Amino acid sequence: MYEFLDRRYALALYEVGEKNQKLEEYINDFGEIVHLLKNDENINQVVNHPQISTSEKKKIFMEIFKGKIDEKLLNFLLLLLEKKRIHDAEGILTQLNKISLEKHNKVVAEVRTVIPLTDNEKTTLASKLSAKYNKIIIFKEIIDKTIIGGVYVRVGDDVIDGTIKFKLESMKKVMLKEE
């Protein structure tokens, strides 16, 4: 349910950013703001304090961010405060990034390996995934020693598990079934 609302807010911010040709700036600045909301104790105290009114919170946000971020992005933050949706900022950022990828015909492929892929392996994997999904592939590489060997790829909800760990677990299940 909240994902739907997050997407609506994200789409509104995306459209404003695109219209003003500041989309990348909005994504980067909003990402930093989300990081602050999660990690800055002072901002957390202000946002979560029940005795600080919404109008006071808005004034504080104006003092913190005015002149440091685009005015339309600041207005977006103030709207989130007013609608009591500031706690959804991380979900909105996630949806904003998804929308940006969709609009630019890109998709993120999470790739887990024991050792980093070579440039040749990345190129080969990117071309195969690009052909399958008909999108530009952006790699999110993760080094994971627990997979023992092979490669694990996740694109959206699709998983391609060619890891030794998976093969060993599959063999174990087959062997235990036969007993």
Curated annotation (Swiss-Prot):
Location(s) in or outside the cell: Cell membrane
Keywords in alphabetical order: ATP synthesis, Cell membrane, CF(1), Hydrogen ion transport, Ion transport, Membrane, Transport
Subunit structure: F-type ATPases have 2 components, F(1) - the catalytic core - and F(0) - the membrane proton channel. F(1) has five subunits: alpha(3), beta(3), gamma(1), delta(1), epsilon(1). F(0) has three main subunits: a(1), b(2) and c(10-14). The alpha and beta chains form an alternating ring which encloses part of the gamma chain. F(1) is attached to F(0) by a central stalk formed by the gamma and epsilon chains, while a peripheral stalk is formed by the delta and b chains.
Gene, per the UniProt record: atpH
Record membrane topology: Peripheral membrane protein
Record's protein name: ATP synthase subunit delta
Transmembrane segments: none
Pfam families: OSCP (PF00213)
Function: F(1)F(0) ATP synthase produces ATP from ADP in the presence of a proton or sodium gradient. F-type ATPases consist of two structural domains, F(1) containing the extramembraneous catalytic core and F(0) containing the membrane proton channel, linked together by a central stalk and a peripheral stalk. During catalysis, ATP synthesis in the catalytic domain of F(1) is coupled via a rotary mechanism of the central stalk subunits to proton translocation. This protein is part of the stalk that links CF(0) to CF(1). It either transmits conformational changes from CF(0) to CF(1) or is implicated in proton conduction.
Native organism taxonomy: Bacteria, Bacillati, Bacillota, Clostridia, Eubacteriales
Gene Ontology cellular component list: plasma membrane; proton-transporting ATP synthase complex
Principal subcellular localisation of the protein: membrane
MF-aspect GO terms: proton-transporting ATP synthase activity, rotational mechanism
Gene3D superfamilies for this protein: N-terminal domain of the delta subunit of the F1F0-ATP synthase
SUPFAM superfamilies from the UniProt entry: N-terminal domain of the delta subunit of the F1F0-ATP synthase
Highest taxon, organism lineage: Bacteria
Homology family: Belongs to the ATPase delta chain family.
Disulfide bonds: none
